[in-house]
Amino acid sequence: MTIMRKTHPLMKMVNHAFIDLPAPSNISGWWNFGSLLGLCLIIQIASGLFLAMHYTPDTTTAFSSVTHICRDVNYGWLIRYMHANGASLFFICLYLHIGRGMYYGSYSYMETWNIGIILLFLTMATAFMGYVLPWGQMSFWGATVITNLLSAIPYIGTDLVEWIWGGFSVDKATLNRFFAFHFILPFIIAAMAMVHLLFLHETGSNNPLGIPSDCDKIPFHPYYTTKDFLGIVLLLAFFFTLVLFFPDLLGDPDNYSPANPLNTPPHIKPEWYFLFAYAILRSIPNKLGGVIALVLSILVLALLPHIQTAKQRSLMFRPISQFLFWLLVSDVFVLTWIGGQPVEPPFIIIGQIASLLYFTIILAFMPIAGLIENKMLKW
């Protein structure tokens, strides 16, 4: 008798992707974040669906509808905080996933890597639009400031901003369309994640050594399903600790005040996961230059496969590149801190140095280190 999972058209796809998939025998816990991101997406879509049942995308009632969810809906407060903190968790996993890809040279799988960058842009767009929906002070002013950046685009900028706003300022039309896009984008992200997996399974997973592992593969189930399950348990433990004990730890107190176009908050800043890019944006005095730097701060990842000079794929046996990688990680932490600070000395100069260092490490120091390490291999 044939096994159903190997013959049934639908089950066969699941089988090839999650059960009989040949996986390298030595992949570490850093490879858990793909499945954890899948879990985060499921949490966000499920909690978001229930929130959408009670939310009204209208400037007069949006803020009070969120209040109503927290006060009057059964476990509404839990769903709302799961959704808000789920976004933070999503980005923690996302940045760790990207960091692992950079450390172990996973960017050599160019199709998978490029789809990943598109996924990052889509997730950032979704999170930004979601932050606007509660219609608090930071929602309104964040939407105004960030959408206004598009006016820096020559010739079409102003028209583009007014087209996105649906008027001459951020108002009801903006909130309505942001809600529509915020609802549909996670499903597009889910579809793109499938494409991401499709490309990954064409080549097979990378491993910590960065060498071909065809001679030593093991089935995904039960080895990595159990390993992923452990990761999921740990992630959920951290997640519910955050949601139930410190729900407002990562939020902004200003967003508990209803949006008021006549009163500007003293420090307009996005959620913590955008602060590093926001710091890079602010470090350039020119508006168009800042917008270009902001986009490049993410788009620079697409250059990694093209500026790779080292003969070894992984950084595991490359001490100079390892030092530069951790310097880059530290630099991103500094940028995140600077993004949350007011625009005044000494934060301005620290932000400018950190921004310059960010691009210099990726575009210059890393390729040079690769060449030096190639020479060291011959000694």
Curated annotation (Swiss-Prot):
Main location: mitochondrion
Protein's membrane topology: Multi-pass membrane protein
One GO process term, biological-process aspect: mitochondrial electron transport, ubiquinol to cytochrome c
Compartment(s): Mitochondrion inner membrane
Membrane-spanning parts: 33-53, 77-98, 113-133, 178-198, 226-246, 288-308, 320-340, 347-367
GO molecular function annotation: metal ion binding; ubiquinol-cytochrome-c reductase activity
Keyword field contains Iron: yes
Keyword terms, alphabetized: Electron transport, Heme, Iron, Membrane, Metal-binding, Mitochondrion, Mitochondrion inner membrane, Respiratory chain, Transmembrane, Transmembrane helix, Transport, Ubiquinone
Complex formation: The cytochrome bc1 complex contains 11 subunits: 3 respiratory subunits (MT-CYB, CYC1 and UQCRFS1), 2 core proteins (UQCRC1 and UQCRC2) and 6 low-molecular weight proteins (UQCRH/QCR6, UQCRB/QCR7, UQCRQ/QCR8, UQCR10/QCR9, UQCR11/QCR10 and a cleavage product of UQCRFS1). This cytochrome bc1 complex then forms a dimer.
Other noteworthy facts: Heme 1 (or BL or b562) is low-potential and absorbs at about 562 nm, and heme 2 (or BH or b566) is high-potential and absorbs at about 566 nm.
UniProt name for this protein: Cytochrome b
The species this protein was found in: Dipodomys insularis
